[in-house]
């Protein structure tokens, strides 16, 4: 029966208060509400989780063991549910082999296109490569010395899985006796059983020949047989050369012959032109030097000696420590004596020649080393290997993972010198379409690529066009979808690990539209994140198109424009955490405005707003940080000035260069200056001035505050340290002799050892997801019975960890050290979270605000530069209002706050704006305009200014 609604009854997951809701099917539905109100609990943890669980449960038990089965959500019933697909922001692969091209499958079609219509060119001559005839092959073989023993091999299997019983049976029937299987020669009757799940190489020994003048047609006949067996390819293996032969060839050398592709001048040959040779994830295509990563790692002098101001004796050479090793100290003393320098001088005082010898070694020059072991002295004359060669040798020979990780701290990366960062073998890069190889195509932006493909059809001949027609259609469709979701600035070669959550979500959204599915429930988590207002309209049209295909589109969203375009809105609230979890309002945007209890409605109707400041700050006496000549990524020799003591916003369309300018260049360069040992690699620039005016630079990002369940807001902000100190001072604790460690769940003593302070025990299930059960020894309290007997105002330390920030504030009202830490968490809008809530359960926005709270609670020097990249991610407009008060408070304390932001409510409150653009990718990287919000709004060339104008009225 085709139902009209997805009916949810009795939803109680997380903070949901037994809610009932009817979601119209085949509509564009927005779920909104304050951060932490229960939107994701309804959309993802209830509706999507149940849809996914029902699908997985329908599979066989064998299939289920390979899939993650969702726990049944806490809901009485859900009817009218369709197959569910979640497009969230947490599933970006960090694998360096995953790229925009591989995620969207465009690169797979590109590989097919190049394999079918690409033309190979000789790297040596630049001429097209032609096939070899059997006669040409015979002539090449006859150039070998007479008496050379050779094998002619037919490679019938090259890197494929299987047992190949039929192929081997056919070879037996044809009379072949010997094979080379995975490098081992064996009789065809004694062939070992092949593992069908492993890749194999099988070569038939077609003929064994000793070259002489009387061979007649035997060579040509054997070549033809071999070529027929292996689809036009044969190998010649030199088994033995005559003793007195003077030749460039070597024993065991292989020569590849192909009826298809071979350069007559240089001898460069292609065994095949198949899609796999264009794959950097295949051994047939990957560059052998970087193994398809496109990067090489090398020991970096600047990481080995990060601070040139200190001496060798005091530890300038970091991997060699502070020369506590007697052997290292005596080695360095011998070098200093030989080359007449002092290990007590600052490293910067050493000559370039001495530095080169220290890093690279003394070459052939022997040095007198004198080593003492207490009882005797040993004198050795030998060259000095050098710091870098010594580290390379250690890295190559050591097996300890810990030591390898330690050595990795001294490595940097650069483009692979063999493939120039293209990831592929020369064989793949020599195949071109209209003089462009596949690596160059992958480096084009989506917008440039779309234009290139638009003109490509005119440049292909009739045969090529006939072959490529369907491939081009698939590629063009996918490019169009990526353009429609505002990702025209990305390149296909961009690693997926470098994408923001919003970018990766929109890529998967584009892929879903390309799949053309209907009758599906799509659940999306804030797809507008990271998107400039200009591109938002295109995104909304894409979501509508997904709906028009016959799907239900359920979007967790705070964006006003999206709400106005939605068919239906569900507002969860009224507050966050325990104050939320109810359906406050339902209807379209106009209807939501009329609900008094709806905070969303108040902002939509204009009853509540974020006010434009009446005046802007001008900063500290014209002091500024000045970055000159930034050229990282797409930046076009950019110069900027950031006035200190202001709230400055960096704006611009997606991909314009904001993060390249602020994070990759300014932040990393300033951090490197303030902390020379920091392992950061700034983008290229000429000068950075004004750093003498700041003492710290802090990037408050959305990365987790901890990786384990034991990390929580109380431990991160330092509140828990004071809470433990307070418990230690209680009379009962003193009487028992308890120390601070007694109240820690990270060390033995006071914690429950059954669960090691986690409060939960993990039980592995084979056909079901792992189950976490409450520890039955401590009942989930994390501590042992004796520790829990210590109470303050009737509450144990475990009870306090279960309190919300609001409750804990009231509880510790009279204890300033604890209260001050908690009040900052409340100020950033996190009053609803539990102070002991696991860090792994906090959203990116919540983690960022916990970090902000920690900064607020510090004693301010008034000389800190804070950088925040899109701090409004995941925030309701009311939360943004609270966040702005906190950020402006930091500025009022004398600090400088720099935000990269698209949200116009934030931008309009800035003292100073730097607009980067005008477009994304190659068409960006310039400063369009800078100044006050009014200056930006007055600039006709600024996309930001055009939209900002409406917000300043």
From Swiss-Prot:
| Residues annotated as binding ATP | 33-40, 652-659
The protein's matches in InterPro entries, at most eight in alphabetical order, are given as:
ABC_transporter-like_ATP-bd, ABC_transporter-like_CS, P-loop_NTPase, UvrA, UvrA_DNA-bd, UvrA_inter
**Primary place of residence?**
cytoplasm
Q: Which PROSITE patterns match?
A: ABC_TRANSPORTER_1, ABC_TRANSPORTER_2
Q: Outline the residue ranges of the record's C4-type zinc fingers.
A: 752-778
Annotated GO CC locations: cytoplasm; excinuclease repair complex
Key word Lyase present:
no
Positions of the ABC transporter domain: 320-599, 619-949
For this UniProt entry, the molecular function terms from Gene Ontology, in alphabetical order, are:
ATP binding; ATP hydrolysis activity; DNA binding; excinuclease ABC activity; zinc ion binding
Any one Gene Ontology biological process term? SOS response
Superkingdom of the source species: Bacteria
Task: Work out whether the entry's keyword set contains Signal.
Answer: no
Arranged from A to Z, the UniProt key words for this protein are: ATP-binding, Cytoplasm, DNA damage, DNA excision, DNA repair, DNA-binding, Excision nuclease, Metal-binding, Nucleotide-binding, Repeat, SOS response, Zinc, Zinc-finger
What is its subcellular localisation?
Answer: Cytoplasm
Instruction: Please give the family membership noted in the entry.
Output: Belongs to the ABC transporter superfamily. UvrA family.
What role does this protein play? The UvrABC repair system catalyzes the recognition and processing of DNA lesions. UvrA is an ATPase and a DNA-binding protein. A damage recognition complex composed of 2 UvrA and 2 UvrB subunits scans DNA for abnormalities. When the presence of a lesion has been verified by UvrB, the UvrA molecules dissociate.
Query: Which proteins does it associate with, and in what oligomeric form?
Result: Forms a heterotetramer with UvrB during the search for lesions.
NCBIfam families membership:
PRK00349.1, uvra
User: What is the name listed in the Swiss-Prot or TrEMBL entry for this protein?
Assistant: UvrABC system protein A
């Amino acid at each position: 029966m085709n139902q009209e609604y997805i009916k949810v009854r009795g939803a109680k997951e997380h903070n949901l208060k037994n809610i009932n809701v009817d979601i119209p099917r085949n509509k564009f539905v927005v779920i909104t509400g304050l951060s932490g109100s229960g939107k994701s609990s309804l959309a993802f943890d209830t509706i999507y989780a149940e849809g996914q669980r029902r699908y997985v449960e329908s599979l066989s038990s064998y299939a289920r063991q390979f899939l993650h089965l969702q726990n049944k959500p806490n809901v009485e019933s859900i009817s009218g549910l369709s197959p569910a697909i979640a497009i969230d922001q947490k599933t970006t692969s960090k694998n360096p082999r995953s790229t925009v091209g591989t995620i969207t499958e465009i690169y797979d079609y590109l590989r097919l296109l190049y394999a079918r219509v690409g033309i190979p060119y000789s790297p040596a001559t630049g001429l097209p490569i032609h096939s070899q005839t059997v006669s040409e092959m015979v002539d090449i073989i006859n150039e070998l010395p007479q008496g050379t023993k050779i094998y002619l091999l037919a490679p019938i299997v090259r890197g494929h899985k299987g047992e190949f019983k039929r192929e081997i049976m056919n070879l037996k029937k044809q009379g072949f006796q010997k094979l080379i299987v995975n490098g081992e020669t064996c009789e065809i009757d004694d062939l070992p059983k092949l593992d069908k799940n492993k890749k194999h190489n099988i070569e038939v020994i077609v003929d064994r020949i000793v070259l002489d003048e009387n061979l007649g047609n035997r060579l040509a006949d054997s070549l033809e047989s071999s070529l027929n067996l292996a689809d036009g390819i044969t190998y010649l293996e030199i088994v033995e050369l005559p003793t007195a032969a003077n030749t460039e060839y070597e024993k065991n050398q292989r020569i590849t012959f192909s009826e298809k592709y071979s350069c007559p001048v240089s001898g460069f040959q292609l065994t095949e032109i198949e899609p796999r040779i264009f794959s950097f994830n295949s051994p047939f295509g990957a560059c052998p030097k970087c193994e398809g990563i496109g990067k090489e790692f090398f020991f970096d002098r600047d990481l080995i000696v990060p601070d040139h101001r200190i001496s060798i004796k005091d530890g300038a050479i970091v991997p060699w420590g502070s020369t506590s090793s007697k052997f290292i100290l005596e080695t360095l003393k011998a070098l200093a004596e030989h080359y007449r320098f002092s290990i007590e001088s600052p490293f910067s005082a050493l000559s370039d020649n001495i530095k080169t010898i220290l890093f690279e070694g003394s070459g052939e020059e022997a040095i007198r080393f004198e080593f003492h072991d207490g009882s005797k002295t040993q004198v050795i004359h030998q060259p000095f290997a050098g710091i870098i060669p010594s580290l390379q040798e250690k890295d190559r020979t050591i097996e300890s993972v810990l030591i390898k990780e330690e050595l990795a701290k001294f490595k940097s990366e650069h483009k692979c010198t063999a493939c120039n960062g293209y990831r592929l073998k020369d064989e793949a890069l020599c195949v071109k379409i209209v003089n462009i190889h596949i690596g160059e195509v992958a480096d084009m932006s989506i917008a440039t690529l779309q234009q290139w493909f638009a003109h490509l059809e005119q440049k292909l001949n009739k045969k090529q066009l006939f072959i490529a027609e369907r491939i081009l259609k698939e590629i063009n469709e996918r490019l169009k979808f990526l353009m429609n979701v505002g990702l025209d600035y990305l390149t296909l070669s961009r690693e997926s690990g470098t994408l923001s959550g919003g970018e990766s979500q929109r890529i998967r959204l584009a892929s879903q539209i390309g799949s053309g599915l209907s009758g599906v429930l799509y659940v999306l988590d804030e797809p507008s994140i990271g998107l400039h207002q200009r591109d938002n309209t295109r995104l909304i049209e894409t979501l509508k198109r997904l709906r028009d295909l016959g799907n239900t589109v359920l979007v967790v969203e705070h964006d006003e424009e999206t709400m106005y375009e939605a068919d239906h809105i569900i507002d969860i609230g009224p507050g966050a955490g325990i104050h939320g979890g109810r359906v406050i309002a339902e209807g379209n945007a106009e209807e939501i405005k009329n609900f008094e209890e709806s905070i969303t409605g108040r902002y939509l109707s204009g009853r509540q707003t974020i006010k434009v400041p009446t005046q802007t700050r001008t900063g500290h006496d014209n002091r500024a940080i000045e970055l000159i000549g930034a050229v990282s990524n797409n930046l076009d020799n950019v110069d900027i000035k950031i006035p200190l003591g202001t709230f400055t916003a960096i704006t611009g369309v997606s991909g314009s260069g904001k993060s390249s300018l602020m994070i990759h260049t300014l932040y990393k360069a300033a951090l490197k200056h303030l902390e020379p040992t920091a392992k950061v690699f700034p983008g290229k620039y000429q000068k950075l001035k004004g750093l003498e005016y700041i003492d710290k630079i802090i990037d408050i990002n959305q990365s987790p505050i901890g990786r384990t369940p034991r990390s929580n807001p109380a431990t991160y902000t330092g509140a828990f340290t004071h809470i433990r100190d307070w418990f230690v001072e209680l009379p009962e604790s003193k009487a028992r002799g308890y120390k601070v460690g007694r109240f820690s769940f990270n060390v033995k003593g006071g914690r429950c050892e059954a669960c090691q302070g986690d409060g939960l025990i993990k039980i592995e299930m084979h056909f079901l997801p792992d189950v976490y059960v409450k520890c039955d020894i401590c009942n989930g309290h994390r501590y042992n019975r004796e520790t829990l007997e210590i109470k303050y105002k009737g509450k144990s330390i475990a009870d306090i960890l279960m309190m919300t920030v609001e409750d804990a504030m009231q509880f510790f009202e009279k204890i300033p050290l604890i209260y001050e830490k908690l009040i900052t968490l409340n100020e950033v809008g996190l009053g609803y979270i539990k102070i002991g809530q696991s860090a792994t359960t906090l959203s990116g926005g919540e983690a960022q605000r916990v970090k902000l709270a920690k900064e607020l609670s510090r004693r301010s020097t008034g000389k800190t530069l804070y950088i925040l990249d899109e701090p409004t991610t995941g925030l309701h407009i009311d939360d943004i209002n609270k966040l702005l008060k906190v950020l402006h408070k930091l500025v009022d304390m004398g600090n400088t706050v720099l935000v990269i932001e698209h949200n116009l409510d934030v931008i309009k409150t800035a003292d100073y704006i730097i607009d980067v653009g005008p477009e994304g990718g190659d068409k960006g990287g310039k400063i369009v305009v800078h100044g006050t919000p009014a200056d930006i709004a007055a600039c006709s060339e600024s996309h930001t200014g055009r939209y900002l104008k409406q917000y300043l009225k």
